[in-house]
Amino acid sequence: MQVFSLWLETFLFHSRIEDLIDQCYEHQPPDTGVMHDIWDSPAKQSLGPFTTTKNNFTFSFFIDWFNLFTNKISDKTVSCGAIMIFCLNFPYYLQYQPENTYFAGITPPPYEPSVITITALLDPIVKQLQYFYHGQVIHTY
């Protein structure tokens, strides 16, 4: 498993990182009501001041299961899952780029994990994230 704190230090050590992150705090949702990304969402706004306070980061935790062989229903199905974390403080067009993605782990094939298995896979990841809950100082570029 990739260590989140080391990935975060590397992620934040880019020459334009502060300018890119500042863009999210300057973002104003459009008056049209059309949502283009998470920053336009009423649900995001309902999370309170933590997500809108400068230098606080918001991450998206994502698991995507896929068939290793194909997506055809008639063929053999072997399910595997990628566990990823994205920084939502980046402009939308950069959030999901591979270089900005923390690859947290993978669920083992051939079946989707049970509740017990997924808990065992996610617990170490959550423990790494808990370290940052009350804030940590990480130097940028």
Regions found by a protein language model. Give the residues of each.
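Domain-level cores of phosphate- or acyl-group-handling catalytic modules
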Residues: 1-141
